[in-house]
Every structure is written in structure tokens, then in C-alpha cells.
Amino acid sequence: MTTEFLQISEKNIHILEKFITINTSENFTYYKKRNKEAINNHIVTVILHKEEEIIGYGHLDYEEKVWLGICVLQKYTRQGYGKKIMDFLLKEAKNKKIKQIYLSFYKNNVIAYQLYKKVGFESICKKNDVCYMVKNL
């Protein structure tokens, strides 16, 4: 079984809703602070899936800067899916001529930090429990 990316829009937003419902990670709080209609302001929003099984989520959005967000469901972590989502989003950013991408994560999320360093993000600051990183494309 191969994995595929599905671009999320208003037409298939129910798939994003399913992801939000089944994701139990305390490290992914994006939709706790926003409603699902936030995708209307995204540059790209994708779900990585294998047949009917959702594996993870990723997006690029613009809030004064371009921000990248990803989340892999717990049972799929450390299997290369985070890197696959990251590579897809970075390619999308390059295709759209984006020059710089930011991300944030909770400092206790060591798995995320390792992935972000691996793909070339650099730490820029920490505020309380949140770390910020940037990558020039």
C-alpha cells in the first residue's frame, strides 16, 4: 500500500475534521486555537493517507510570515511520515517562490525538533515552552 497526499478544501473538509477528532497529541494545538475554516487562508493543506487510514497532516499558512505545521498520528511516528509531509510542504513552498518558512513547537517535542533540524530549520528563539525555528529556501 502506498501513501498519498490529499489536498484539503471546503469540498472535503470532513477528512480534516476526522483527523482533528482522532488526533490525541497534546503537541498539536493548531485547531484548538482556530476553527477548521482557517484552511481558507492556507497556502496549502494536506492529509497524508494510506487507503482509508489517515497518517498525518500538514499545512502552510500566512500570518504575517509563512508558517509550516505538521502532525503525524502517534501510531505512525518514527516511520518517516513526518519527513515525507515536510518534504512535500517544502517543495510546495519552493514552487510558490516562498523564501522563508517559520514553525513553532513545544520544547518537550523532541521528535519534532530532530525532524526540523534534519531538514535544515534553525532555532531562532524560545518563549516559555514554545520554540521557534526558521528555514531559508
Question: Language-model segments: what does each one mean?
Answer:
Residues 7-75, 92:
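Acetyl-CoA-dependent GNAT
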Residues 61, 69, 104, 124-127:
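Solvent-exposed beta-strand sheet faces enriched in polar/charged residues
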Residues 129-137:
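Terminal substrate-recognition subdomain of acyl/acetyltransferases
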